[in-house]
Swiss-Prot record:
Name assigned to this protein: Small, acid-soluble spore protein H
Protein family according to the UniProt entry: Belongs to the SspH family.
HAMAP family in UniProt: SspH (MF_00667)
Keywords, comma-separated and alphabetical: Sporulation
Top-level taxon of the source organism: Bacteria
Xref: InterPro entries: SASP_SspH
Gene: sspH
Organism: Alkaliphilus metalliredigens (strain QYMF)
GO cellular component terms, semicolon-separated: endospore-forming forespore
GO biological process terms held by the UniProt record: asexual sporulation; sporulation resulting in formation of a cellular spore
A Pfam family that the UniProt record links to this protein: SspH
Length: 59
């Protein structure tokens, strides 16, 4: 996923399905300098991680 689309998903009022390693996630924010996103699994909001944008898949 590119950074522009990730930002659009964050700003969207709708819930857009995105996965990381096959698991549904929520994108919290995007770091444009490192091309990464801070995410958490939908079912584990307390488990945050920073992952490469390239590994995020929109469905």
């Amino acid at each position: 996923m590119d950074k522009t689309r990730a930002q659009e998903i964050i700003s969207s009022p709708n819930m857009i399905s995105v996965t990381y390693n096959g698991k549904e996630i929520y994108i919290e924010n995007v770091n444009e300098n490192t091309q990464t996103a801070n995410i958490h699994l939908l079912n584990k909001p307390d488990k945050k991680q920073e992952v490469p944008l390239n590994n995020l898949v929109e469905h």
